[in-house]
């Protein structure tokens, strides 16, 4: 039986705070508008953090009766086919297993975190894949004849299409599966976890840092990118890779809410659509499910599905740090890896599992301890869960910076926090109501967005816009000739 606290959390969920995909939807309706059935091609990087939100969007589209072809890595064939979409495999260098980027780009193992690591990751993981991604995309378009392409923001194989004639391609909608990759108002470069400048001195410091970042990362990777684009007959680009796709997409769906982004000028093509619904039934209930009855505070710790090769970074120290907290039940998920790989004894107040059903779990969680995966952070916020974050790799420094900046949690700003720091941070978030209050306000903002309707409306609108533009071009070019013939 649920306690008052747990029952309240469930009531919040039922009222729309937190999103879980429902099997019963109003078929083919967007607001009061009936949509046409479309052929939609999904294009996705073969990495779990990109795949999960695109699969959730796929299920929304399938429920509307749309025909979905899903282009991604062969390692995810079973997941795509089980969703009801038709699987289309990436080819050549584009078909890799992004669940372990160190196996994809082995040289990153020998490069310490820093600017050189970012440059190599951008060039080897993203730029080098563009020709094969683009060729795979062209083949899929030829075979599927889609009305629209929906891609994740790091499937850069769409760039040659975006740089070509719009009339020669389907409309392209991209999904922001990371923080919004636009230039910052204070001039700070992205990916370094720098807080918004509050003084002119900070702005001057950021200008110096930006020059160093531009010389070490942006310019070399842009040179590499433009060489690749030149071989495909397009380009060059003048803006950095991640920034360019935001500006070039016909529509860009940021999978979050405005409150979680720094204030800045945002193009009208960018739409905040909330977080995609959790797909239910991905894992069974654990045998200890009844223990999450609200009698103890539940702390969930996860390292996600990418940076989970070393559980000594976060999961093990969190389990040990909270072992003597009598009012806390710690739940750890291994992101699909065997629980035996967790390198510590499991304390009596902890429960572990390889996978857990998040649609059941999140309404019962009081604090999430995470390395800062964008999808996990946004899902937690949509349920009003405050956070403790510790991660500096990939995009995590900037994601976790936003956690602290928005007031929904504590950012430890390190890849390997100490047990003492973890315990203090968790107790701070549990014991100070301000964090839960800010997380609750964030959940309210998520609840105000009808994610399903927004996604359907945006995709439908870009298709309509494309048809109108093509019709207008036809009228403009053929109108006078028709008039002459009518004489």
Predicted stretch roles:
Residues 103-160, 205-247:
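Conserved nucleotide-sugar donor-binding subdomain of glycosyltransferases
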Residues 126-205, 259-260:
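Conserved nucleotide-sugar donor-interacting segment of glycosyltransferase catalytic cores
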């Amino acid at each position: 039986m649920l306690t008052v606290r747990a029952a309240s959390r469930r009531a919040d969920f039922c009222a729309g705070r937190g999103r879980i995909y429902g099997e019963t939807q109003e078929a083919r309706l967007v607001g009061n508008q009936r949509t046409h059935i479309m052929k939609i091609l999904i294009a996705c990087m073969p990495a779990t953090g990109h795949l999960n939100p695109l699969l959730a969007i796929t299920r929304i589209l399938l429920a509307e009766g749309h025909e979905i072809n899903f282009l991604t890595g062969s390692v995810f064939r079973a997941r795509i086919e089980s969703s009801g979409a038709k699987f289309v495999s990436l080819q050549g260098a584009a078909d890799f297993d992004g669940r372990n980027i160190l196996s994809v780009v082995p040289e990153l193992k020998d490069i310490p975190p820093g600017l050189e690591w970012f440059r190599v990751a951008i060039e080897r993981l993203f730029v080098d894949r563009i020709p094969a991604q683009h060729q795979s995309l062209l083949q899929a378009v030829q075979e599927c004849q889609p009305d629209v392409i929906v891609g994740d923001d790091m499937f850069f194989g769409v760039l040659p299409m975006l740089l070509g004639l719009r009339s020669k391609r389907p409309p392209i909608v991209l999904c922001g599966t990371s923080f919004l990759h636009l230039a910052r108002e204070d001039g700070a470069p992205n990916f370094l976890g720098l807080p918004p400048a509050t003084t002119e001195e900070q702005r001057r410091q950021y200008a110096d840092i930006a020059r160093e970042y531009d010389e070490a990362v942006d310019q070399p990777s842009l040179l590499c990118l433009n060489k690749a684009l030149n071989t495909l007959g397009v380009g060059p680009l003048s803006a950095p890779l991640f920034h360019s796709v935001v500006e070039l997409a016909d529509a860009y769906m940021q999978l979050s809410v405005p409150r979680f982004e720094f204030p800045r000028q945002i193009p009208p093509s960018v739409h905040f659509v909330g977080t995609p619904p959790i797909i239910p039934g991905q894992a069974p209930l654990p045998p200890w499910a009844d223990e999450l009855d609200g009698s103890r505070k539940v702390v969930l710790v996860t390292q996600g599905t990418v940076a989970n090769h070393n559980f000594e970074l976060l999961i093990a120290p969190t389990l040990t740090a909270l072992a003597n907290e009598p009012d806390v039940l710690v739940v750890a998920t291994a992101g699909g890896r065997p629980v035996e790989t967790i390198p510590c004894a499991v304390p009596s107040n902890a429960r572990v599992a390889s996978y857990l059903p998040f649609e059941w779990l999140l309404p019962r969680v009081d604090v999430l301890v995470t390395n800062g995966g964008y999808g996990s952070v946004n899902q937690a916020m949509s349920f009003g869960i405050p956070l403790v974050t510790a991660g500096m790799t990939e995009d995590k420094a900037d994601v976790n910076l936003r956690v602290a900046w928005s007031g929904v949690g504590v950012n430890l700003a390190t890849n390997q926090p100490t047990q003492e720091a973890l315990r203090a941070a968790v107790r701070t978030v549990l014991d100070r109501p301000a964090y839960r209050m800010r997380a609750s306000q964030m959940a309210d903002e998520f609840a105000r967005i009808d994610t399903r309707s927004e996604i359907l409306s945006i995709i439908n609108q870009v298709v309509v816009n494309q048809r109108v533009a093509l019709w207008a071009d036809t009228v403009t070019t053929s109108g006078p000739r028709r008039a002459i013939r009518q004489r």
